[in-house]
Amino acid sequence: MTRNSRPNIVLLMADDLGVGDLCCYGNNTVSTPNIDRLASEGVRLTQHLAAASVCTPSRAAFLTGRYPIRSGMASPYNLNRGLTWLGGSGGLPTNETTFAKLLQHYGYRTGLIGKWHQGLSCASRNDHCYHPLNHGFDYFYGLPFGLLSDCQASRTPELHRWLRIKLWISTAVLSLVPLLLLIPKYARWFVVPWKVILTFALLAFLFFISWYSSYGFTRRWNCILMRNHEIIQQPMREERVASLMLKEALAFIDRYKRGPFLLFVSFLHVHTPLITKDKFVGHSKYGLYGDNVEEMDWMVGKILETLDQERLTNHTLVYFTSDNGGRLEVQEGEVQLGGSNGIYKGGQGMGGWEGGIRVPGIFRWPTVLQAGKVINEPTSLMDIYPTLSYIGGGMLPQDRVIDGRNLMPLLEGRVSHSDHEFLFHYCGVYLHTARWHQKDCATVWKAHYVTPKFSPDGAGACYGSGICPCSGDVTYHDPPLLFDVSRDPSETRPLNPDNEALFDSVVKKIEAAIKEHRRTLTPVPQQFSVFNTLWKPWLQPCCGTFPFCGCDKEDDILSTAW
């Protein structure tokens, strides 16, 4: 493609939106006319899959086109499955190449508005090694972390109570170690280097600070609004943030309307605490969650309206999705604050069940893609990376494995079969499930090797623990639970050798593919290690004098669109 023929690209990603929350995917209680318009004017994918069932690893895969385990963005722990502190030292490694960096190299102006949650700094609070501007974005306005219930002072804190308990126990144990080591040192029983004693003392201090900070500093230290490298609000004023993000997104389109541009709008909707403007409260039939969905849909409408007004619609590819499925366990009393995953079992945090990983996937490009088309083939969020590389007119990196596939032949109708024969579904670093789409037919087999134990039994979610674990208290299956999701998408009828003649051959084929996949994995630094996820005072972004951080540099006058 020539520079003049390459389209503008607008990527719209919701946070924790269930696939069953949209009218175009079967919901009849929440009104989403603008997202439905995208679907009616474009192509709708019905088997679109996230590479992880929680946000940080899913977004890492989206940005890089690679399974999170390849970049170290998959966790071996049940509680630390995402980045816990903005002042931690983990993040999307600098040697990973995002689609923004590719398109920037191809001559696109690139912008990210909204949630990042891929880390910020490595060694000092101002090095910003993981910052969006160091990952290919020319402009960033939003949250370098993500939205938490802690960001709204009136809400119940989101940091899990069991995480706090573990932090406290770790603090106590690590505090005892240097004290116990001092005894043999001064008794001269054996030599204990001061370096060892001080290392344990430092670790004890870091665990103590992380535990202490979880009881009141989370909002001030995690809920920060930035423009490029500058802190704009600390803590952010939650009632204003959606207004400011929309204004910035529309301004970016206006600024670079001569193109080509890439705009990634990473909504805070519909993550708790479901911050919603007064004009949308009570707007839906589904409570505050539905109100938040409808506010997001309205924001999508404003972006589409701007593209129309600037006469960019026909020359702009618009894509809408969610980072993972809706969360089932989030409640306030008897009120459900999470989304609907429709007919699919499970939800956010569950590595293999469809409800945690099946997400909306809508593409609109009026002059190229057929309006109203529906594709039932397996596709992945990782496919956006090679698709954008193709559209932008460039080449994929040749020095690494790219797990995504270019979707344009499928979207344009040049092929009818997905290029994915196998897809692997991880929960943290643990492979829970694998999917096989036979090349010669429409059948999609899915084998579960690990599934969560729901609590209470039969509840369909892990209400007792808040999120389903990836290891430990889980159910292991040998032989695996096998489903034909092309005929049984709700995964209610497990197959076995008695009711499926192909059972043994299918399982053998999938297990051979898993072995081949694992041969392609190479060891990388673990970004969710205990040390990386600990809060570190020297990495904490601060507007003002640490630890008394605070500022608001935004104008008081907001867009009249609100």
UniProtKB/Swiss-Prot annotation:
The modification 3-oxoalanine (Cys) is found at C55. Its EC number is 3.1.6.-. It is found in: Membrane. The conversion to 3-oxoalanine (also known as C-formylglycine, FGly), of a serine or cysteine residue in prokaryotes and of a cysteine residue in eukaryotes, is critical for catalytic activity. The keyword NAD does not apply. Keywords: Calcium, Hydrolase, Membrane, Metal-binding, Transmembrane, Transmembrane helix. The keyword Hydrolase applies. Its cofactor is Ca(2+). Substrate binds at K115, H271. GO terms for cellular component: membrane. InterPro entries: Alkaline_phosphatase_core_sf, Sulfatase, Sulfatase_CS, Sulfatase_N. It comes from the Eukaryota. The chain crosses the membrane at residues 167-187, 189-209. Ca(2+) binds at D15, D16, C55, D323, N324. One of its GO terms (molecular function) is arylsulfatase activity. The active site is at C55 (nucleophile), H117. Its main location: membrane. PROSITE patterns: SULFATASE_1, SULFATASE_2. It is a multi-pass membrane protein. Binds 1 Ca(2+) ion per subunit. Signal peptide: none annotated. It holds the Pfam family Sulfatase_C. Belongs to the sulfatase family. This is Arylsulfatase H.
